[in-house]
């Protein structure tokens, strides 16, 4: 029963924590693989380091690096896992590029979509969970979090607001595969709603 489920949302939405807890519950019934973008495999993790931890990068270079990382991740991990009948839970995928580089960076959603369609070669998610959090709440969570902030975390509030606008545009263009979860709530509540949404989809 191979299924490709992605998780999207702005910085501070809690994707990593939600995926961890949801995957633990799903693993009691299903064969689950969890992964992330950028990253997931060695080559993609190296690209992640360059893009997120390096100095300022040209916005088109940034978009192309994310697409290259995505291609390697697909070929090395996502596609083999799906072919083996597993359920793949992925922290970010093509919609992140559309919202961040396409809309917030101003390259254009259409242009970034074309670039990424070459990379994914038709492999869109079966289901995408969008963790919907207010920009200010997300920003405060980042500041309170002990993890080291990356280059995108450090962007101004206006950038993160544009990311959210970009996601809304992407969702309105693809309503058939998105489920919105209010991520302003407590982690436990978000996890429960996300888990129930996925179970309903799978059954």
Swiss-Prot record:
Record's catalysed reaction(s): dTMP + ATP = dTDP + ADP
Entry's family note: Belongs to the thymidylate kinase family.
Segments traversing the membrane: none
The enzyme's E.C. designation: 2.7.4.9
Keywords annotated in UniProt: ATP-binding, Kinase, Nucleotide biosynthesis, Nucleotide-binding, Transferase
UniProt entry tagged with the keyword ATP-binding: yes
Biological process (GO), any one: dTDP biosynthetic process
Function: Phosphorylation of dTMP to form dTDP in both de novo and salvage pathways of dTTP synthesis.
Gene Ontology terms, MF aspect: ATP binding; dTMP kinase activity
Species annotation: Staphylococcus epidermidis (strain ATCC 35984 / DSM 28319 / BCRC 17069 / CCUG 31568 / BM 3577 / RP62A)
NCBIfam families documented for this protein: DTMP_kinase
Keyword Zinc (UniProt): no
Protein name: Thymidylate kinase
Positions with a binding annotation for ATP: 9-16
Top enzyme class: transferase
CC terms in the record's Gene Ontology section: cytosol
InterPro entries: P-loop_NTPase, Thymidylate_kin-like_dom, Thymidylate_kin_CS, Thymidylate_kinase
Pfam family, one: Thymidylate_kin
């Amino acid at each position: 029963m191979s299924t490709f489920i992605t998780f999207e949302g702005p910085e501070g939405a809690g994707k990593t924590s939600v995926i961890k807890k949801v995957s633990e519950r799903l693993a009691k019934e299903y064969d689950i693989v969890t992964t992330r973008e950028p990253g997931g495999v060695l080559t993609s993790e190296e690209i992640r380091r360059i893009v997120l931890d390096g100095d300022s990068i040209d916005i088109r270079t940034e978009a192309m690096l994310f697409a290259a990382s995505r291609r390697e991740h697909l070929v090395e991990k996502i596609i083999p896992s799906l072919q083996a009948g597993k359920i793949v839970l992925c922290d970010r995928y093509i919609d992140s590029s559309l919202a961040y580089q396409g809309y917030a960076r101003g390259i254009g959603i259409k242009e970034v979509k074309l670039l990424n369609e070459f990379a994914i070669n038709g492999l869109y998610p079966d289901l995408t969970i969008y963790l919907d959090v207010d920009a200010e709440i997300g920003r405060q969570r980042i500041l309170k979090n002990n993890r080291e902030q990356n280059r995108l975390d450090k962007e101004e509030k206006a950038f993160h607001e544009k990311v959210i606008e970009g996601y809304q545009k992407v969702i309105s263009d693809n309503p058939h595969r998105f489920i919105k979860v209010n991520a302003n709530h407590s982690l436990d509540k978000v996890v429960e709603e996300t888990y129930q949404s996925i179970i309903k989809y799978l059954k």
